Structures are given as structure tokens and as C-alpha cells.
Amino acid sequence: MIAILHPGNGTGSTLDRNNGIAVFFFAILPGLSPNFNSFILLASMVSGIYCLTTARFSLNLSKSDRLVAIGMSIYPLVMIASIFINPPYSEVPDWIFRLLPFFSIWLILPRMRQSPDGRLVPLFILGAGIGMIITFLFSLLQIMFLMERAEAGTSNAALLGIIGLLFGGIALLNVQSPRSVEQRIAILGYAAGLGCVLLSGTRSAWLVIPVHIVIFLWYFRKHSFHLSLRSLAITGSLLFAGLIALGSGQILHRIEALQANMASLERSDGEVTSLSARLALYKGAVSAISKDPLTGYGPQNRMASVLAELPDNIRPQLPYSHVHNGFLTAGIDAGVLGIAVLSLMLLTPLIGAWRKEPGPGRDLAIALALLLVSSYVITGSFGIMFNQKALDPIFAYLVALICADRGSTNFAPVVRC
């Protein structure tokens, strides 16, 4: 049975059970319905406020926790300041609400600490594997019957690619479990995550796969397998061959599209393609930042300020809601300071993991942090990074989860029998 149904005894059992349910389903749902992730995060924040005000538990944040929480909070504070500096103000409440996930660590980390060390992270990793398997099957049905690029439940192919990459990678960390069921879910979950990446046609996510492989080599070199390397090699090879066969059409289609876009750029015939549109947005963003590097334009004026820097004949052909680069987006929103605080926030999971005492918990936290940061930085340099209803809660929740356990924690299997 799954340990989610059997929290420890004592006064913290109800909170522990609720924590387990929240963490487990948060890991399952991103590719199926990201709105539920936002709901889980918001509900956890409200519960945290209630429990702190009624003294059911204390804030209980270490010096390292506070450093991470402050690093997370500076980014939204700078963005809110930029919103107030730059009119119009009609969207101020909406933007403040959208930035709330980045403050959540102050509330959900003390709540997570009501569960025993080593309980929540294994639940999340198992949930990620299960979620990726279900999401992949959903994506496969879309490709077979409906869509050119799979979206699963995300309504955005690029978002599915990022989620598949990150949560598939997280799922594979469970291959070291002593339980064969968890090992199978880990391998299938990783393969399913890669399948989602391929079926979504998210080219920026393809770039992250080699980086993740290096992270896995570092992590698994330090920790023994309960699965024989021969079995792992055979299973992995078969799954890899199956994924390539399944996704070859999508891979070739996306490569051909990129080649066509590059050929159009060389011809300089004025045709606006996906690639030329992004390059135009980058140029417009750099030009806009150079004109107001101190305060930026505020997120409410983001695209208007970029489009104002582009020729009149190109503007109507760029129906994008973001610049396709997270760092340039932060620079437009709040100037050079915006880029700096974004970079700081991206470092917070690594800071939280690195500052733990040595042990299995620290190694796992570092692996999670590296998977998280590399996924966001690389894909976010070519597409979506933050200010997105799914990616913001995922980042905030994972940062809290990374900080939750001590570095010396030993993790037990979730499946007990």
C-alpha cells in the first residue's frame, strides 16, 4: 500500500496526511490540469496562514530557509514596485495576485515541516512518474486523432515539453528504490516524460536532455542501484528505441520547420516565420531595455514596449504574449534590476540544497535543484519561464520541497507492500 494513506501517529497526523495528499497530487497533475496545481498551492497557503495564526505550528524557518525565502520574495517585490512606477494601474490587482506564488514558501515550508523527514519527497517523485505515464498516454491520443503537436491537459505544447522534461527527470530519481514497482514507475515515467517532450515538438526542451543526463550520472554515481545495470541498460535501450520510432515523425517535422525558417532568414524576403519573429522580439526587447534600464516598463506594458521598437510592417504579424526569453522579459518589466533578481531567484533552489548538511537528503535535494534550474533556464531562454499559471506554482512548490528535509535524511520507499 502507498504510505500516503498511513501518516505517522501523533498530533501532526492530520497535517501529515494532508501534506502527503497535496504533494502526491501536485506531482501527478501538471501535465493533466495545471490549474489544479495553482489551486493546491493556494489552498496550502491559506492553510498555512490559518495554522500560523492559530499557533498550530510555528514559522520554524532556519537561517538557510530564510535566505531562500528572501531570495524568492525579492523578485515579486521588484515586479510589484515596477507595476506601481509605470502606469496604467488598472491591472495592478491582477498582477499582484499572479505574483503571489513566489511568496508561498513562507507559508508552505512550515506546513511541510509537520511531516516527518523523508516522507514528502519520495511521494512527489513517485507521483511525478505516475503523472508522466498518464500524461504521455493522453498526449499519444492527441497525436493519433487530433493535433499536430501534443498539449495533453496544458493547452500549450511548449508547456507540455517543459513539464515532461522536468517531471520525467524527477521520476527517474526513483530508480534507486529497493521496490521493483517504484523502479518500473521511475523508468516508465522518465520514458513517458521524454515521450511528451518529443510529441510536443518543444525544441528548446530537447537541448536540456543532455544536461539532465550529466546530472543523473553525477547523482547515481554516488548512490547504489537495487536494479542490475544489465537490466537497466536493456530496458532503457528498448524504451529509447521505442521513443525514437514513435516520435521520429514529430522530430523530423520540427527540424524541417527550423531549416525552413533559417532558409527564409537567409533569403531576407520579408517573410515572418517563427524564428524571424523571435529574433525581432529579442531585438525589440534589447532596444526597449537600453532606453529604460533602471525601472523598466512594468509587466502590464511588456509587449507594447517591445512592439514599439519594431517596424510598423512587422508588428501586426507578431501575435505573441511574451518575448520568448525569460531574462529579457524580466529586463523589460523592471530593467537591469529585474534581470538580477530573476537570476537570484533561479539560484534559490541550489542555495537551499547546497547549504544542507552532507548526506543522502542533501544529494537528492541538489539533484532536484539542478533538474529544476536547468529546465527553467534553458527552456526559458527560448520560450516561457515565469509569469505563467503553471510554471510559477511548480517552481515555488519545488523550492519549498527541496528545503523541507535535512541533508542527513534517509528516504524510505513509498510502496510498502
What would you call each of these model-derived segments?
Residues 1-90, 111-122, 126, 174-181, ...:
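Transmembrane signal-anchor hairpin modules in multi-pass inner-membrane enzymes, especially those
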Residues 25, 116-147, 155-222, 246, ...:
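Alpha-helical transmembrane segments of multi-pass inner-membrane proteins
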Residues 45-46, 345, 369-417:
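Transmembrane alpha-helices of multi-pass inner-membrane enzymes
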Residues 52, 56, 210-234:
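Perimembrane helix-loop-helix junctions
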Residues 67-79, 88-111, 123-132, 154-166:
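Aromatic-anchored transmembrane helix interface
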Residues 146, 268-283, 287, 291, ...:
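Long extracytoplasmic/lumenal interhelical loops at the membrane interface
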Residues 199, 223-268, 283-291:
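A membrane-periplasm/extracellular boundary helix in multi-pass inner-membrane enzymes
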Residues 312, 333-374:
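Hydrophobic transmembrane alpha-helices and their immediate junctions
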